[in-house]
Amino acid sequence: SKGSMGNLFYYEDALHAVGLRKRFDWPTNTSILKISNSGKVSYKFHSFDRNVVKAEVNESILYFLYEDSGKTLLRDATNNIDLINSEVTIKDFAFNDEKTYVIANSFSSPDEIYELSNGQLTKISKANNSFTKKVKTWDCQYKRIDTGKSEVDTWGIFVGKDKPTILNIHGGPATQYAFTFFDEFQTYASAGFNVIACNPRGSSGRGHDFLRDVCGNKWGVTDMHDVLTSFKNMKKVMGITNKNDGIMGGSYGGFMTSWIISHHPNMFKSAIVERALLNWETMV
């Protein structure tokens, strides 16, 4: 095969995997692929336009995790239903004695093990109880913002309208910020900063076309528009009046931070460029 794949499993008497049918298709969704006896690779669910994270078969039923608009959800692919549709991130799942167990977190709650039944999560572990009893955690405000050219999933932690704000840009860009517990955001908020983050075009979780909308000469154009427009609008939604704004990001987020401050040098009071990819030719 010319693809890039892993997570091999058998389903309906055929070998399957999660990955790319052709390795140079990236960036695109990782999908469930069917591998014939002759080695031919085809899409199992060609119309399912989301990024598949993990797949597993249990009692002849195929389940998989997938990203969708900042959530990572568990789907019964055989019966074409989601087992949960909450603002959570499911990181892994397993089955035992006809019960479903998941490792999950949310924006304000770190990882725990839950039993999943009828779309509801029941916590059964206490791994982070001592942490959450001692440490204040911050929940988010969420809004899908219309930038005029796209709709962008945007999150904000509100500390105070008179507090400074950090715009944080994720790496990738083919990944997503999410309804997940992110220690960096929690640390910034606890230090007194409002935090805003978004999934601009180029991010995963919104399908193939959205993910590839930074390719070619759109790099640094469509994504910068989405980042800055969603940031400005989210500040208004949150009622923040302080104009002391900072910007930061790592990897691709470091590139975008550098790109933005070079195009808009007076927009932010401070900038932090982390492990940035600034030049494709040299990979510096």
Which residue stretches match the model-derived regions?
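Hydrolase active-site cap/lid region
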Residues: 207-209, 257-284
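Conserved beta-strand position repeated across blades of beta-propeller domains
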Residues: 8-10, 56, 94
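A flexible loop/linker signature enriched in serine peptidases of the S9 family
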Residues: 1-6, 18-32, 45-52, 64-73, ...
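Short coil/turn segments that connect the beta-strands within blades of beta-propeller domains
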Residues: 13, 59-60, 98
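Gly/Ala-rich beta-loop-alpha elbow adjacent to hydrolase catalytic centers
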Residues: 249, 253, 257
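Beta-propeller blade signature
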Residues: 31-37, 115-117
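Non-catalytic accessory segments flanking enzyme active sites
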Residues: 1, 6, 65, 81-158, ...
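Cap/lid segment of the alpha/beta-hydrolase catalytic domain
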Residues: 127-237, 243, 250, 278
